[in-house]
């Protein structure tokens, strides 16, 4: 998944789908830069991370 860092991605959780620029993937968190600001998503909530299609 490190190949997605710096790219526009979709991060899906059970509750929400986030779209933004992937900044960092750690053992505990995913850091995403969105239009609304920075979002930190706990890894245990992440169901899927994929590159956003045009």
Task: Give the positions of each predicted feature.
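Conserved RNA-binding domains used in RNP assembly and mRNA/RNA metabolism
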Residues: 1-54
